[in-house]
Design a protein with these regions (language model features):
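Functional beta-strand-loop-alpha-helix junction segments that form "active/interaction loops"
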Residues: 60-71
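C-terminal regions of RecA-like/P-loop NTPase motor modules
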Residues: 16-27, 33, 46-53, 69-101, ...
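A short helix-to-beta-strand connector/capping loop
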Residues: 40, 44-62
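Structural recognition of the conserved hydrophobic beta-strand(s) that form the central parallel beta-sheet
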Residues: 102, 138-145
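Helical hairpin unit composed of two closely spaced alpha helices linked by a short loop
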Residues: 91-130
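Signature of the SF2 helicase/ATPase Hel1-core->accessory helical subdomain module
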Residues: 108, 145-150
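P-loop NTPase switch/communication element
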Residues: 2-24
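Hydrophobic/aromatic beta-strand patches that form the interior of the parallel beta-sheet core
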Residues: 60-62, 141, 182, 210
Length: 279
């Protein structure tokens, strides 16, 4: 995505969290039929100017072809803003600061002379490990695509749609080098009507399964059922299937606002809460 698109996604998240209003990506850019931005919602975006200023200070986007050479050169240049090297050791200006580096996504990495696309992906993964371990403040996040064999007819017949480590496309090193691996799976795209007792026929693309495939910090092989709401760029954990009596309710994100209205936030630390996974 381009920087304006990234900002639009983040602003849509902010608007929903603060005002409880969904502002579509297309509407924000007045793209498509019946997607003209109204004056009311334009004023709403202007009220987000302070938030956008924060994005300007904290986010830097790089477009164009990506190779390992470009990746390392760019990150080393950026690191100079946050510290310096001393005899091979990186001294951070603020050791508590974390720099998130997102590559979206790895399948768009370009092959170079003498290297295949897989070689470049492996090299970027290897360099990310080095930067992560030597700087102590850099956290590379690599977005990758599953191998298409994950959707093979044979796997569907055997009810083996869940993601595994074998599904990562082009680069096994990416999985091996990662400390944490999250996988997203859409049962609707596989034309499933039910999935782990959830009514996918009703939820359709609003249901996304997130799997913690790997974690060097604790338990892995964890499944989290999520509601995906693209108009406000939110993933929100939904209840267990035996706790859902109206699936239509979970086709938009307003159910979480209704729930928050019933929470006494001043007593939040005094009672047991069911944790929710929200992106």
């Amino acid at each position: 995505m381009t920087q304006p698109q990234v900002y639009a996604k983040l602003v849509s998240m902010y608007i929903f969290d603060k005002y409880g209003i969904q502002l579509k990506f297309k509407e924000m850019f007045s793209r498509g039929k019946d997607c003209i931005l109204s004056e009311e919602k334009f004023n709403l975006i202007k009220e987000c100017s302070d938030f956008i200023d924060i994005l300007d200070k904290r986010i830097k986007c790089f477009d164009g072809n990506l190779t390992e050479e470009i990746y390392v050169k760019t990150l080393n240049a950026e690191l100079k803003r946050f510290g310096h090297w001393d005899n091979g050791t990186f001294i951070a200006n603020n050791p508590k600061q974390i720099l998130g580096v997102v590559v979206d996504h790895m399948s768009l990495v370009k092959a170079t002379t003498g290297r295949t696309k897989k070689d470049e992906m492996d090299a970027i993964s290897r360099s990310s490990v080095i930067l992560r371990n030597t700087t102590k403040i850099m956290s590379p996040i690599h977005v990758a695509q599953f191998n298409r064999s994950a959707g093979s007819d044979e796997r569907l017949k055997q009810a083996m749609q869940d993601p595994t480590s074998n599904d990562f496309k082009d680069s096994g090193s990416l999985y091996e080098d990662s400390q944490v691996v999250l996988a997203l799976h859409s049962p609707h795209k596989f034309k499933l009507s039910t999935y782990k007792k959830y009514d996918i026929k009703t939820l359709e693309q609003c249901f996304i399964a997130i799997f913690l495939l790997k974690s060097r910090f604790g338990t892995s092989d964890i499944f989290v059922p999520m509601g995906f709401y693209g108009d406000c760029s939110h993933y929100i954990e939904i209840p267990k299937p035996d706790e859902i009596y109206d699936y239509e309710k979970y086709k938009d994100p307003y159910w979480i606002l209704d729930k928050e209205d019933n929470i006494n936030k001043s007593d939040d630390n005094l009672i047991d809460q069911t944790s929710k996974f929200v992106l």
